[in-house]
Amino acid sequence: MKLKYFGTDGVRGIANETLTPELAFQLGRAGGYVLTKHAKDDEQPRVLVSRDTRISGQLLKHALISGLLSVGIEVMDMGIVTTPGVAYLVRKQEADAGVMITASHNPVQDNGIKFFGSDGYKLSDELEAEIEVLLDADKDNLPRPSSTGLGSVTDYPEGGLNYTAFLEQTIPDDLEGLHIAIDAANGATSSYVSQIFADLNTEFDTMATNPDGLNINAGVGSTHPEGLAKFVVEKGADMGVAFDGDGDRCIAVDELGNIVDGDKIMYICGKFLSERGRLKDDTVVTTVMSNLGLYKALEANDMHSVKTQVGDRYVVEEMLKDGYNLGGEQSGHIVFLDHNTTGDGMLTAIQLMYVVKQTGKKLSELAADVTTYPQKLVNVRVQDKKLALENQAIKDIIEKVENEMNGEGRVLVRPSGTEDLLRIMAEAPTKEAVGQYVDRIVAVVQSEVGVD
């Protein structure tokens, strides 16, 4: 289902250019109406609203809230809380919906609006389509109460504190004895990390915890973990964790300064849970972009995997369908469904630290089971991406390469979700091998269906 406004993670755009306050107002009206129309008749619906630290968040928040109020919704303004914090608090407060204003790991000029249902899950494609119909309607026929039916705003600053208290009780013991380094990306976790990791009795050092509205994700956080890697070594920490702007991702760094990505975090936590009989069906849910090294490590330890398309919402859908409790993405969106309904960076960090403490092993030792295979990705512009995948010559070269790999590599050819591109990716034991495999497939794609 191709939507006009909603992408894989809400509505995104350049703040005040494509994501305007006018659009935020309309999203408040349309989204608020769709998500609360089934609220009990005897009470006004309630919606939680939060944002990350980017400067445009204030502009968009006020516009969005105005839209919500105009259709008679009571708004609880939480200030700055993480995306997974909103997902948790919607359920705790028994609210009708939650809205997070963020562009996650994107640069400061971008922003977005992300909705959660009363169950704490991101919206289905069908609900998003219903909102879009109202956004594009010739006439706005939604309710416009003029007095008694209008909504009002209540500040809910304790929301963030309730969320951090929840995080701290997701492990049965504290983390005393661990020395950790934390990169908060100058984002939504900045004002919470010191309190949480002090309460858990860690020794900790922090970086990128001083947001100024403009420095969110700027060379720091989960998409730029190199700075944290140096910081860990410099401080002599046992490990480091980096979050992104809205706190739904976590990338770790071991005591030697090596990056421990989402694949390795899933493996480490999955193995720990599996050994204790707490990993449902001994299965981890991943996306097609997870590295072959993860699958080999899972297999070697009698664990299974299920693959979905790219996007943490699809991981969650698969987990719900079959009752799995651990899944995620290489990028650091890790979902612990026993605790929260979406990827949660601080929750992931706490679970990973707990494994390190309980096993008594260094993070580098725990991550060593996963050998990351060299990967190469090339985008090729084509006339028709759907027809390209049905081309016999392309099918033949993919099959030939896969046969040559003989289980020691993999090929993934998939269409771009937004452009007429084929994404050609391969993994193999050496850089030379993976380069040669990809180049051969690219040559056939270009000669058969490529566009100069």
Curated annotation (Swiss-Prot):
Catalytic activity: alpha-D-glucosamine 1-phosphate = D-glucosamine 6-phosphate
Keyword tags: Isomerase, Magnesium, Metal-binding, Phosphoprotein
GO annotations of cellular component type: cytosol
Obligatory cofactor(s): Mg(2+)
One Pfam family hit: PGM_PMM_IV
Catalytic residues (UniProt): 104 (phosphoserine intermediate)
Comment on bound cofactor: Binds 1 Mg(2+) ion per subunit.
GO biological process: one example: UDP-N-acetylglucosamine biosynthetic process
Protein residues bound to Mg(2+): 104, 244, 246, 248
PTM section of the record: Activated by phosphorylation.
Modified residues (Phosphoserine): 104
EC number: 5.4.2.10
One annotated GO molecular function: phosphoglucosamine mutase activity
Broad enzyme group: isomerase
Sequence similarity: Belongs to the phosphohexose mutase family.
UniProt xrefs under PANTHER family: PHOSPHOGLUCOMUTASE (ALPHA-D-GLUCOSE-1,6-BISPHOSPHATE-DEPENDENT) (PTHR42946:SF1), PHOSPHOHEXOSE MUTASE (PTHR42946)
Function: Catalyzes the conversion of glucosamine-6-phosphate to glucosamine-1-phosphate.
Protein name: Phosphoglucosamine mutase
Lineage: Bacteria, Bacillati, Bacillota, Bacilli, Lactobacillales
Gene this protein is translated from: glmM
